A protein has these predicted regions:
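Juxtamembrane loop-helix boundary motifs flanking transmembrane segments in multi-pass membrane proteins
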Residues: 1-4, 56, 122-126
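Membrane-embedded alpha-helical hairpins and interfacial helices in multi-pass inner-membrane proteins
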Residues: 27-34, 64-158
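Interfacial segments of multi-pass membrane proteins
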Residues: 46-48, 61-66
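Small-polar-interrupted transmembrane alpha-helices in polytopic inner-membrane proteins
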Residues: 18, 55-63
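Hydrophobic transmembrane alpha-helices
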Residues: 1-46, 50-53
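Membrane-helix interface "capping/anchor" motifs
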Residues: 45-56, 92-101
Length: 158
């Protein structure tokens, strides 16, 4: 029972932090050339698979602040976030749960998902949006992985 309580608490805190960061940085968290600072939390999924659920919940709630709120923001992106987080976790396990690997995988899946969503919503060509999204998502996840590595030198947070 204690393990489930701890995991539930981690998911709630993770999702809440994600939402707060999306809200605080809302001006740069949306649109075609987004830089979602909340993404620094994604690499943490490398250590706890259950955090993929927290990430998906955080995306769903954080997207309430989106100027494009609708089915893509409340259904498609949370599902893609759950899949990206789960895939990132599985690949990172092959590399000793490395934060950088998890972040790179998650960022790749999310940048493709956001690019596709923008092409559906605004008829923006994926070739125009994908390169910038890929770079910005990788940057955010790299910073996050570095932060998690620093935290891990002092604390076992998971």
């Amino acid at each position: 029972m204690e393990r489930k309580s701890r995991d539930l608490t981690l998911v709630a805190v993770y999702a809440s932090l994600y939402v707060v960061l999306v809200y605080l940085f809302a001006p740069i968290s949306f649109y075609a050339f987004q830089f979602r600072v909340a993404g620094i939390l994604r690499p943490g999924i490398a250590r706890k698979r259950i955090l993929a659920a927290g990430y998906a919940i955080g995306v769903a709630v954080g997207n309430i602040f989106s100027p494009f709120a609708g089915p893509f923001e409340f259904v498609f992106m949370p599902i893609m976030s759950l899949l990206a987080g789960s895939f990132g976790y599985l690949v990172a396990r092959l590399f000793e749960s490395d934060y950088f690997v998890a972040g790179a995988v998650i960022a790749a899946v999310i940048s493709m998902s956001v690019s596709w969503m923008l092409s559906m919503l605004f008829n923006m060509p994926m070739l125009a949006t994908l390169p910038y999204l890929f770079i910005s998502e990788q940057m955010v996840c790299f910073i996050g992985a570095f932060i998690f590595k620093l935290i891990e030198t002092r604390f076992r947070w998971w």
